Structure formats: C-alpha cells, structure tokens
C-alpha cells in the first residue's frame, strides 16, 4: 500500500463534477453524492498517475472502465474512511457492477479528513472472482473495529491482504504492464 496527498484543486474539480453530473446511473444502489464524490476523487487521482487527467462527467457513463493502461481496462474502486487504512481492512464491491468489461480493479481508500488517498492494491477480475466473498442485500457485516452495517445491495468483499501489493506509483505501473 502507498498513500498520496490529494491536491485541493483535484478535490474542487471533483466537487464541481458531482454537482453537475449524476455518476450513479444504475437502476439501484447509486450512492449518495458524498459516496459519488469519494469515488470520483479516487478515480481522478489514479487517472492522474497515468497522465489521463481528471474525471470529466460530460462524456456520460463509462461502462465501468475508468482508464486503459497497457491494453487493460481498469476500474478504480474507492471507499471513504475517516481512519488510516490497515492491512486487515476489507474493500466492498457492488455485485451489480460485476458485469462490466473490466480487466483490473484498483482498490483505494480516501481519508476524508486528512484528504489522502491510499492505494490498497490491485487484482485482476479473474483473481477477484476466485478470492471475493459474497453477501446478499440485508446481510449484517462487521467492520475491522467491530461496528456493524447492513448491506444495502448484494455485495462482494475482498481483503487488502488478497490484493497485489504496490509500494509506489511506479511499482503500480510496472506491475500492470
């Protein structure tokens, strides 16, 4: 895992994008504006790593492909947090996004108070299908800190320890080549 500071200009750009565009174009479980903002921030930071700029919502729905690198389609999944990420943490993935034609998932956590993004790791869709755990809508899940929440949609989980670890932007790019 590695953590980077998020440029305030990127955050402001993402706020404008979320105010102008609805990034929850699914039939259900579209996420709140705050959840959409978290996702757009994570996606924009990772896009910027690869020289792809920031998210531009005017192009419409991206079919689950946030960027392409080394001929691989990549979907960036970002969870919002108010604590630093730990290796034992879990990443959530909505089942209804499973049909997208994506080769790679990059899982991130955005610390909303410190405004830093942690790249937790990445995994191929093929490996994700093998390693993930499924929880139907309404399941009660227990977090790392022993608090609980009820799933609002069918959900997959994968732990940080099951992702390919990366130590830097360069390491991430080299592993994805």
Language-model segments: which ranges?
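Nucleic-acid endonuclease domains
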Residues: 1-70, 77-177
